A protein has these predicted regions:
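N-terminal positively charged helical leader segments and presequences
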Residues: 1-101
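Structured adenosyl-cofactor binding patch, chiefly the S-adenosyl-L-methionine
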Residues: 28, 33-34, 131, 152-158, ...
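Short, glycine/polar-rich helix-capping loops at beta-to-alpha or helix-loop-helix junctions
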Residues: 50-52, 144-150, 214-223
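Short beta->alpha connector loops at strand-helix junctions that form conserved
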Residues: 68, 114, 140-141, 162, ...
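A short acidic, often aromatic-flanked loop/helix-cap motif at beta-alpha or helix-coil junctions
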Residues: 69-75, 92-94, 170-174, 192-194, ...
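RNA substrate-binding interface of SAM-dependent RNA methyltransferases
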Residues: 101-190
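Active-site/ligand-binding-proximal alpha/beta "capping" segment
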Residues: 185-240
Length: 255
């Protein structure tokens, strides 16, 4: 960021840990998410009327700062910002226990990511979770990529449209879910159950996806109700985590 750009933004007291969110869909989703604090909206003179109308019609209380397109390039480290950069807090995540206390729907689908570390994979999986009508995505407090602009962009802004939960000890959280009548399935290439064969009449299902390299941890596997697999060409070694998660969630979402 140039000194000129810093001077334009300094008066808004943006926290040091703020992230910038760029692109039309991610910016809109962030501005409408009550679990996020948005500080300022940076756009070009050409796009001012569009974004001004958007925040007025959606009753979003935020200041607009006009910048040149090249300045937005610098802020976002990208030339794919589409004329919009929003400075925001990270999403305020609920605890799983807090979410379950307020859970009223019998049919609930929860996705748990167990030590996935690639931001692009995590963002893509969150996007698929929203697309296939999952209700929440659980991220471990540790061994999970921090929320960044690239992760948000990879989710196409869907991270702001689905409930994001934070969990600690996974085995303990699995037991909490079981007490709330969730059936817990883990996606694993050595699973005995084909993903399309699970009983989807179970009202509450939690699906766990393991890390990109090692997959599910042994202790996690031992606490499952079942390990499920995706049938693929036997000459193909495996799918990557994001693709496998998408296929599994699609199958679970089918009636």
């Amino acid at each position: 960021m140039s000194i000129k750009e810093m001077k334009k933004l300094n008066e808004f007291n943006i926290p040091n840990n703020a992230i910038n969110i760029y692109g039309n869909h991610p910016a809109k989703s962030a501005l409408l998410n009550s679990n996020r604090n948005c500080y300022i909206l940076c756009t070009t003179e050409k796009k001012f009327d569009y974004w001004n109308d958007f925040i007025i019609s959606n009753q979003v209380n935020i200041k607009i700062v006009l910048l040149e397109s090249f300045e937005l390039n610098n802020l976002s480290n990208s030339n794919n910002h589409q004329g919009i950069v929003v400075f925001s807090s990270k999403i305020i995540k609920k605890k799983l226990s807090e979410y379950l206390k307020k859970l009223s729907s019998k049919k609930t689908r929860v996705l748990i990511l167990d030590q996935l570390t690639d931001p692009q994979n995590v963002g893509s999986i969150i996007r698929s979770a929203f697309a296939f009508n999952f209700d929440a995505v659980c991220l471990l407090k540790n061994n999970t990529p921090i929320e960044t602009s690239s992760l948000i962009k990879a989710s196409a802004g869907e991270i702001d449209k689905i409930q994001i939960l934070e969990i600690g000890n996974l085995v303990q959280e699995i037991n909490i879910l079981k007490k709330q009548n969730f059936f817990i399935y883990g996606l694993d290439g050595e699973g005995k159950i084909k993903i399309q064969e699970i009983d989807k009449t179970d009202n509450r299902i939690a699906l766990i996806i393991g890390s990109e390299g090692k997959g599910l941890r042994n202790l996690t596997k031992q606490n499952m109700d079942g390990l499920v697999k995706i049938d693929i060409n036997p000459e193909c070694n495996s799918l990557n985590a994001a693709n496998a998660a998408s296929v599994a969630m699609y199958e679970i979402s089918k009636n």
